[in-house]
Structures are given as structure tokens and as C-alpha cells.
Design a protein with these regions (language model features):
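Catalytic adenosine-cofactor/nucleotide-binding cores of aminoacyl-tRNA synthetases and other
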Residues: 9-103, 194-232
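Extended, non-catalytic structural segments that build the interaction scaffolds
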Residues: 55-69, 111-130
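Residue-level signal for inorganic ion chemistry
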Residues: 73, 132, 184
Length: 331
């Protein structure tokens, strides 16, 4: 028998539960279509600790996409590949010079897999993602500290520039390997821009800094996470959700009216009977003429036959149907 059972928490909306009757259920297909399944999955696992309740809002989702995926990850990839393309035509030279700014970034990148593994083993997915994005943040700060645009002004500093870009690309590769369980489609796009071979996408390769060849070829590609205009997007989502809520309320209206209508028993009202067609009235009278129904079992054989006793009264053309109805009622 299992010794531990893990369960996820509740996903709340504005502090309350979601329900179809309220018409406030968040449509995951709509969000995945607008922002990608990778972005939605990242947000849910990054913001909501496993096993705890989480409060969802469109604003939180958009802010997380803009801050982490657009500003940090997407910006780091775009800057790295764009500078490699601009200064070296995408092909980093073999001759490279290290600098004092390298040590801190390389230390963080080399120890990332062990920290990530410990968090994943503890089901602390939000911490594992935080570890990865801490290194991504350090890489963005590394760009500011080394100022590649300044190094590019002198031919003498080109080897140093090449090393800076290599360190950025290799750091990105390690982070991307570890992000694969969360954002598989996005990671393949990043690998393509970094020109990473199959052996550079493995779990083992994330523990070593230097898997990319020194003369790596980088490809400037599409912006994997364009920044979202939050105000405009929130207004559009509000309109879409209002339409969905109205549709849900309209769909529930007939059922609610049916529940509120009192159930009728006994004979039909005089008004209903007067309005009914002759054949329907005859059948109604025939049903009410049934005073007694008894199941009679014929003996003498294994076969059993049901007979129905009733008082006369039904119209001849309704007799069979009334008998069947009486039989059903007896059962």
C-alpha cells in the first residue's frame, strides 16, 4: 500500500470557489490558446505551491508571463542571439578571454542542477522554478556588468566579447534543460536558436558547464514570449468572460424555471383538459379510471403471465396503452 498520497489544493477565483452555476469557471482552453500551454503551466506551478490552495486571477497570470517569461527568459535569449548575430554573424570565434565577472555566474550555473533536483524530489516545484529563474536573472545582470556593446567597439576586446556571449548561451542551455518538464515546446524553440544537439539536452549535461562547443553557432529567432499589454488584455478577457457567463446563465435558465414550477398530481386541471386534444383527454380519463391493478401469476408451468384487472371505462383505442400503464404502475 502507498505510504504517502499527494493531492493538489483548490484553485480559487478572487478568494472563492469556481462553479458553473455562478458562471465564473476559468476556461483553461481559452488561456492556453491566448498565451500557450507552456505559459499557463509555468504560471500554475510557479505561483501555487503543490498541495496548497491558490488564488487565480487574469492579472496575476499576465504579470507572471511579463515578468518571468518575457522580461527575463525571453529577453535573455533575444539579447544573446541578437548580439551574436550582430557582432559575429552568429558564429562565435574560438579565441576567447575570460574575465573577473565570469566566476559568479558560472558557479551559480554549475550548482543549479543539484539545487533543482532537491526541490523536485520534495515536490517543491515552485522552488525548482525559482532556482532556475534566479540563474536567468543573474545572466541578465551579467550582461549589464560586462557591457558587450562596449567590448564590441574594439577589436582587441573581441575575444572577451566572444567569451561573454558563450557564457550566456551555455547558461541558457543549462536552464533550458531543466525547464523541459514545465515548458517542453518553448524549450525546443530555445534549443533551436542555441543550436543545441541531442547530447546537450540531457539531464546529465545540465551538471556540466561547457557542453556547447566554443565556436557555437547561434540563430536569432522569433521572440518566444512577446510582452503583453496588460490593460488591453485584461479588458479583452473581461469581455470574453462576461460573454461566457451570460451564455452559462442562459443555458441554466430553463432548468431553473422547471425546478420552480410546482409538480402536478392527480387529474389534469379543467383548463388543461379543455385545451388538450380529444385523444389526449380520452387517455387522461382512461388512466384515472384505473382503480385496481394486480399482477396475477399463472400456475402450472415455468412461464409466468401477467394479467391486469381494471374497471371498465377507457376508450377502446386506448385500452392497450392503459393496461400497459397500469402494469408499469404495479411494478
Amino acid at each position: 500500500l502507498p505510504k504517502h498520497v499527494y493531492g493538489h489544493g483548490w484553485l480559487l477565483l478572487d478568494g472563492g470557489k469556481m462553479s458553473k452555476s455562478k458562471g465564473n469557471v476559468v476556461d483553461p482552453y481559452l488561456l492556453a490558446e491566448r498565451y500557450s500551454a507552456d505559459a499557463l503551466r509555468y504560471f500554475l506551478l510557479r505561483d501555487f505551491p503543490f498541495g496548497s490552495d491558490g488564488n487565480f486571477s487574469n492579472e496575476l497570470l499576465i504579470n507572471r508571463i511579463n515578468m518571468d517569461l518575457a522580461n527575463d527568459l525571453g529577453n535573455l535569449l533575444s539579447r544573446t542571439t541578437a548580439m551574436a548575430d550582430k557582432y559575429f554573424g552568429g558564429n562565435l570565434p574560438i579565441e576567447q578571454d575570460e574575465g573577473p565577472e565570469d566566476a559568479a555566474l558560472l558557479e551559480k550555473a554549475r550548482g543549479l542542477r543539484d539545487r533543482y533536483e532537491a526541490d523536485m524530489e520534495a515536490y517543491a516545484f515552485q522552488n525548482a522554478l525559482a532556482d532556475v529563474f534566479e540563474v536567468i536573472d543573474n545572466a541578465n545582470k551579467y550582461i549589464d556588468a560586462t557591457a558587450p556593446w562596449v567590448l564590441a567597439k574594439s577589436e582587441d576586446s573581441k575575444p572577451r566579447l566572444a567569451r561573454v556571449l558563450y557564457n550566456l548561451a551555455e547558461t541558457l542551455r543549462i536552464c533550458t534543460v531543466l525547464l523541459q518538464p514545465f515548458m517542453p515546446t518553448t524549450c525546443e524553440k530555445i534549443f533551436a536558436q542555441l543550436n543545441v544537439e541531442a547530447d546537450g539536452k540531457t539531464w546529465d549535461s545540465a551538471a556540466a558547464f561547457g557542453t556547447l562547443p566554443a565556436n557555437a553557432t547561434l540563430h536569432k529567432g522569433e521572440n518566444i514570449f512577446p510582452r503583453i499589454d496588460a490593460a488591453k488584455e485584461l479588458a479583452e478577457l473581461e469581455a470574453l468572460e462576461a460573454a461566457q457567463k451570460a451564455a452559462a446563465q442562459a443555458a441554466n435558465a430553463p432548468a431553473e424555471e422547471k425546478e420552480e414550477k410546482p409538480a402536478e398530481s392527480g387529474a389534469a386541471s379543467a383548463e388543461q383538459e379543455a385545451a388538450a386534444p380529444d385523444r389526449v383527454r380520452r387517455r387522461a380519463r382512461a388512466l384515472h379510471s384505473v382503480r385496481h391493478c394486480q399482477v396475477v401469476r399463472a400456475g402450472g408451468s415455468d412461464r409466468q403471465e401477467d394479467r391486469h384487472r381494471r374497471q371498465p371505462g377507457p376508450a377502446p383505442d386506448d385500452e392497450g396503452q392503459v393496461c400497459q400503464r397500469g402494469h408499469d404502475l404495479c411494478r
